[in-house]
């Protein structure tokens, strides 16, 4: 992913650091030393909350509003939340119930939720050769990916055994 970001943004401000999968430090190392997480859409915010660290969600990520993040709706609310948390970090650590909610949500997200999808970001062109659009929209493709596509366009999702 770091390669994708560097290709899209060849000039990055000096205060922004991209951590590649091959770097000696990783996001989990950063979580260990963090007092606060600021998340937009990645799972890092959820994983930070799993460690009892408060997380302010800036975007509309899937775990927003699940009871273990701070969810401002405006920029003014964001800066108020940021000031409140930074003024008393220990008081804003997640309690046991909030941390358990983060763990429960993460388990369901990583192990129960994954749905079949024909293309992945990292191997998109290879996947596209195996699953060209016409094949995905064929009877075979719809039988394999139809429920996923219905969910992605907002139809109610039915869990199957």
Question: Model-flagged regions — what are they?
Answer:
Residues 17-20, 69-84:
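Short acidic-hydrophobic, aromatic-tinged amphipathic segments that line or gate anion-handling sites
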Residues 10, 39-42, 49, 83-90:
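Hydrophobic alpha-helix feature that most strongly marks membrane-spanning transmembrane helices
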Residues 1-23:
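Catalytic donor nucleotide-activated moiety binding site of glycosyltransferases and closely related
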Residues 23-70:
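A donor-sugar binding/catalytic signature common to diverse glycosyltransferases
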Residues 3, 46, 76-80:
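Feature representing long, continuous alpha-helical segments
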């Amino acid at each position: 992913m770091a390669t994708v970001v560097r290709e899209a943004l060849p000039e990055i401000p000096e205060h922004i650091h991209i951590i590649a999968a091959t770097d000696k430090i990783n996001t989990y190392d950063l979580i260990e030393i963090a007092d606060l997480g600021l998340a937009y859409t990645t799972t890092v915010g959820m994983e930070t909350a799993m460690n009892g660290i408060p997380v302010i969600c800036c975007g509309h990520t899937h775990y927003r509003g699940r009871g273990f993040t701070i969810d401002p709706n405006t920029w003014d609310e964001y800066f108020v939340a940021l000031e409140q948390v930074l003024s008393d970090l220990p008081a804003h650590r997640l309690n046991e119930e909030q941390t358990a909610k983060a763990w429960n949500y993460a388990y369901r997200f990583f192990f129960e939720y994954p749905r079949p999808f024909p293309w992945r970001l990292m191997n998109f062109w290879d996947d596209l050769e195996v699953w060209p659009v016409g094949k995905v929209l064929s009877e075979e493709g719809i039988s394999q990916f139809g429920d996923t596509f219905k969910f992605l366009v907002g139809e109610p999702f039915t869990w199957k055994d």
